[in-house]
Swiss-Prot record:
Known tissue expression: Highly expressed in brown adipose, cardiac and skeletal muscle (at protein level).
Residue ranges of the TM segments: 9-25
GO (cellular component) term, any one: mitochondrial inner membrane
Source species taxonomy: Eukaryota, Metazoa, Chordata, Craniata, Vertebrata
GO biological process terms, semicolon-separated: mitochondrial cytochrome c oxidase assembly; mitochondrial respiratory chain complex III assembly
UniProt protein name: Ubiquinol-cytochrome c reductase complex assembly factor 6
Source organism of this protein record: Mus musculus (Mouse)
Mitochondrial matrix side: 1-8
């Protein structure tokens, strides 16, 4: 088996890792409570609160270094 580990130990470790990963994801979703609703009308550009406004400003003003 992988790394010289017996099948029983490998499956125990695999299942416990998977269980811990799923439990951790569930706890994070309970804590942060993400909004998983899908709006019927998509928002217009600029209405999203997650837009990176600093990135938008940098695109319009390219910085040229003087050497």
């Amino acid at each position: 088996m992988p790394g010289g580990v017996p099948w029983s130990a490998y499956l125990k470790m695999l299942s416990s890792s998977l269980l811990a990963m799923c439990a951790g994801a569930q706890v994070v979703h309970w804590y942060y409570r993400p909004d998983l609703t899908i709006p019927e009308i998509p928002p217009k550009p600029g209405e999203l609160k997650t837009e990176l406004l600093g990135l938008k400003e940098r695109r319009h003003e390219p910085h040229v270094s003087q050497q």
